[in-house]
């Protein structure tokens, strides 16, 4: 395959040849070979496929929320070509047997994937580390979806084992002793969008995040572990990660939503950690823009509308996001809030480096041909009805994103969209290819 007239983030306009599954050549011009498919990029922006280092594709255990087939299609439509799945499925991925079961389910994916191992009081590290783990974690320092919170002794033992195995540890950092029990005991009003979801933000405090990050990074420094802090939601948490020499991620919902949005979202805005004050959101965005934050990842954690349409204290935590991460970031770049170089660092270069995905994340000869073609001049509104996730809704309804027109994984077109008459992405002609994904560690 030959892509012609593609613009890269460094300003070059190039032709790019794909040989098999890898990028073969990048030159100002390349002559087509006989019988070679040629795609004219028409000066649109060519990016490395995004790596979402934090998803919950819910299978095995909860296929009514998401499956590897539906989640990976949603990812492909959003320009994500590799995902890393977290261990809090049913059964939890804390044994070799459970890892194998998830691996069987993951073969339905149309993109690349990594599978993380989990830690619990009864995990089986010997069998787990015998499998091709992408990383260990997220290790939960507080209870969240899946009830996999661990005590300090168990966490420290897991970190030491991960160091011995040379594996990165992803940490869900919240200190439950600093949660606000007064808020937890308050009346949260109605159900769904009528709930007083701001109480969730009051309950799971910013101080709880910062304290847990400080603890996790102290353990990391004492043991020499590679600690990665998941979904930091506050400037204090980010600063603690930087001070503790850990890497960290921020989710799109903490970048683009705040407590100000909870009157409209209700329980649809309940996640762990919760949405924060607008001034904290702005400070988090500044740290993403200036390089303090290593990656953006979604914590894609879908639930059905029926599950969200309950009271605040009963509704599950989590929002879908794998399809909208890259489009939202590209729209910020289009508006001058981020550079395109920074977007590529956040979703491609840095996650590939942190999780040792050696053939991913760059547009260079010899790298996997995981590529995304976008038109920055054609942002489109985000609507529930256009989302391919099985959940069928998004917390970003009405916002704008720059969506892919072409997504390739290992040189194969897995998603192609022909923009229509401007009525919206849901009116465009979309095609998915039936391609089998691969485990990035296999």
Please place each PLM-identified region on the residue numbering.
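Histidine-centered catalytic micro-motifs
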Residues: 50-60, 169-175, 298
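Divalent metal-binding segments
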Residues: 56-64, 84-97, 117-123, 139-151, ...
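Histidine-rich, glycine-flanked metal-binding segment
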Residues: 1-48
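His/Asp/Glu-enriched, well-ordered alpha-helical/loop segment
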Residues: 198-224, 295-296, 301-376
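Histidine/acidic residue-rich metal-binding segments in metalloenzymes
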Residues: 123, 127-139, 144-296
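Metal-associated gating/positioning segment near the N- to mid-region
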Residues: 44-108
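A glycine-rich helix N-cap at a beta->alpha junction
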Residues: 103-120
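C-terminal cap of metal-dependent C-N hydrolases
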Residues: 368-442
């Amino acid at each position: 395959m030959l892509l012609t007239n593609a613009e890269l983030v460094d300003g070059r306009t190039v032709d790019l040849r794909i040989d098999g599954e890898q990028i073969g050549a990048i030159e100002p011009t390349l002559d087509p070979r006989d019988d070679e498919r040629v795609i004219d990029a028409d000066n649109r922006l060519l990016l490395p496929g995004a790596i979402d280092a934090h998803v919950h594709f819910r299978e095995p255990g909860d296929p009514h929320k998401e499956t590897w087939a539906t989640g990976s299609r949603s990812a492909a439509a959003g320009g994500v070509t590799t995902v890393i799945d977290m261990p809090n499925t049913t059964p939890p991925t804390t044994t070799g047997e459970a890892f194998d079961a998830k691996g069987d389910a993951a073969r339905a994916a149309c993109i690349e994937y990594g599978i993380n191992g989990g830690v619990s009081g009864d995990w089986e590290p010997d069998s787990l580390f015998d499998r091709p783990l992408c990383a260990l974690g997220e290790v939960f320092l507080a209870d969240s979806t899946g009830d996999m919170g661990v005590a300090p002794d168990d966490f420290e033992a897991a970190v030491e084992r991960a160091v011995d195995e040379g594996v990165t540890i992803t940490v869900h950092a919240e200190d439950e002793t600093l949660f606000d029990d007064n808020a937890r005991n308050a009346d949260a009003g109605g159900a769904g969008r009528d709930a007083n979801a701001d109480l969730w933000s009051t309950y799971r405090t910013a101080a709880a995040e910062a304290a847990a990050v400080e603890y996790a990074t102290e353990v990391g420094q004492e043991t020499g572990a590679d600690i990665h802090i998941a979904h930091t939601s506050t400037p204090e948490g980010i600063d603690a990660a930087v001070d503790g020499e850990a890497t960290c991620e921020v989710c799109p919902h903490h970048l683009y939503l705040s407590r100000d949005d909870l009157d409209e979202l209700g329980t649809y805005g309940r996640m762990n950690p919760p949405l924060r004050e607008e001034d904290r959101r702005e400070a988090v965005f500044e740290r993403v823009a200036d390089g303090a934050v290593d990656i953006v990842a979604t914590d894609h954690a879908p639930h059905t509308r029926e599950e969200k349409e309950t009271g605040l204290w009963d509704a599950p935590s989590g929002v879908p996001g794998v399809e909208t991460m890259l489009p939202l970031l590209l729209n910020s770049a289009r508006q001058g809030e981020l550079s395109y170089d920074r977007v590529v660092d956040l979703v491609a270069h840095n996650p590939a480096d942190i999780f040792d995905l050696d053939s991913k994340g760059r547009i260079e000869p010899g790298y996997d041909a995981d590529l995304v073609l976008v038109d920055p001049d054609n942002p489109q509104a985000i609507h529930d009805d256009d989302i391919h996730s099985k959940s069928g809704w998004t917390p970003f309804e009405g916002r704008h994103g720059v969506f892919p027109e072409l997504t390739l994984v290992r040189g194969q077109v897995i998603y192609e969209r022909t923009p229509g008459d401007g009525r919206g992405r849901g009116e465009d002609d979309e095609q998915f290819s039936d391609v089998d994904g691969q485990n990035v560690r296999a």
